[in-house]
Amino acid sequence: MSSLAQKKTARLKRQIRVRKKIRGTAERPRLNVFKTAKHIYAQLIDDTCGATLAAASTLLDEVSTGLSYTGNIEAAQKVGAAIAQKALAKEINMVVFDRNGFLYHGRIKALAEAARENGLSF
């Protein structure tokens, strides 16, 4: 198995292990983060009814305007700020952070810190 396949398998194992423990509710939804080489995505998910309450990504025009590249830390900070604003608009202050098996480093850390700076607590 190649090293890239091993990294992906290890991330998926971490994702499954954490998903067994983390549950989002309507009062405290799960802030799910996913990243690719070019984009980063964030969703607020209520696991009791399986609904997405809010979403933000670098695919949105409001986030990607002014960015030369959407796969960097600057883009992740804008996504974190956008998801925090959408959550506060729906009167959601507390979330459960789900890093989706990714290491808390780089873009994931930047998104989380930007969300905290803009009013979310986790």
From Swiss-Prot:
Keyword Phosphoprotein: no
GO MF annotations, alphabetized: 5S rRNA binding; structural constituent of ribosome
Keywords, ordered alphabetically: Ribonucleoprotein, Ribosomal protein, RNA-binding, rRNA-binding
GO CC term, one of those recorded: cytosolic large ribosomal subunit
SUPFAM superfamilies registered for this protein in UniProt: Translational machinery components (SSF53137)
GO biological process, one term: translation
One Pfam family this sequence matches: Ribosomal_L18p
Leader sequence segment: none
CDD domains in alphabetical order: Ribosomal_L18_L5e
Annotated coiled-coil segments of the chain: none
Keyword Ribonucleoprotein attached: yes
Subunit description: Part of the 50S ribosomal subunit; part of the 5S rRNA/L5/L18/L25 subcomplex. Contacts the 5S and 23S rRNAs.
Function summary: This is one of the proteins that bind and probably mediate the attachment of the 5S RNA into the large ribosomal subunit, where it forms part of the central protuberance.
UniProt family annotation: Belongs to the universal ribosomal protein uL18 family.
This protein's name: Large ribosomal subunit protein uL18
Source organism of this protein record: Geotalea uraniireducens (strain Rf4)
Top-level taxonomy: Bacteria, Pseudomonadati, Thermodesulfobacteriota, Desulfuromonadia, Geobacterales
Gene name in the database record: rplR
